[in-house]
Swiss-Prot record:
<dbReference type="InterPro" id="IPR036847">
    <property type="entry name" value="RimP_C_sf"/>
</dbReference>
<dbReference type="Pfam" id="PF02576">
    <property type="entry name" value="RimP_N"/>
</dbReference>
<dbReference type="InterPro" id="IPR028989">
    <property type="entry name" value="RimP_N"/>
</dbReference>
<dbReference type="GO" id="GO:0000028">
    <property type="term" value="P:ribosomal small subunit assembly"/>
</dbReference>
<dbReference type="GO" id="GO:0006412">
    <property type="term" value="P:translation"/>
</dbReference>
<dbReference type="Pfam" id="PF17384">
    <property type="entry name" value="DUF150_C"/>
</dbReference>
<comment type="similarity">
    <text>Belongs to the RimP family.</text>
</comment>
<keyword id="KW-0690">Ribosome biogenesis</keyword>
<dbReference type="GO" id="GO:0005829">
    <property type="term" value="C:cytosol"/>
</dbReference>
<keyword id="KW-0963">Cytoplasm</keyword>
<dbReference type="InterPro" id="IPR003728">
    <property type="entry name" value="Ribosome_maturation_RimP"/>
</dbReference>
<dbReference type="InterPro" id="IPR035956">
    <property type="entry name" value="RimP_N_sf"/>
</dbReference>
<protein>
    <recommendedName>
        <fullName>Ribosome maturation factor RimP</fullName>
    </recommendedName>
</protein>
<dbReference type="InterPro" id="IPR028998">
    <property type="entry name" value="RimP_C"/>
</dbReference>
<comment type="function">
    <text>Required for maturation of 30S ribosomal subunits.</text>
</comment>
Amino acid sequence: MSKVLEQVEAIVAPITDELQLELVDIVFEKEGPNWFLRIFIDKDGGVDIDECAAVSEKVSEKMDENDPITQNYFLEVSSPGAERPLKKEQDFENAVSKYVHVTSYEPIDGRKMWEGTLVSYDGTTLVITITDKTRKITCEIPKDKVAKARLAIQF
């Protein structure tokens, strides 16, 4: 995480804690000519528009006082959606028995992408059951080799 995003997280985390919401992720990215600061929040049962608006208002007030971001940007606060990213240890633990999409930095047993059920996670290794054509295969993926992981929708 960049120093600027760490400073933004230091501003946002107390606000989400106060509102009893989980801070899922913070992303600062450019789309076309515009910059966006995207804050993703959640709670059991999901968040509603009023909670997103409350976080947006409070974050906006705090950022106006001492904004670590020098350029102009749009602030967006939303739910992470059905395919929420898995980043923190707790995210992986909560995803056990759920359908996930995982990519790795380098091939593991000839693969860089897996989509299947996360069978277990012990803090260092993800165990995923995938379907390859008609057979089920269990794959072990070291956590330190994971580039991205998210919940996925199974069709």
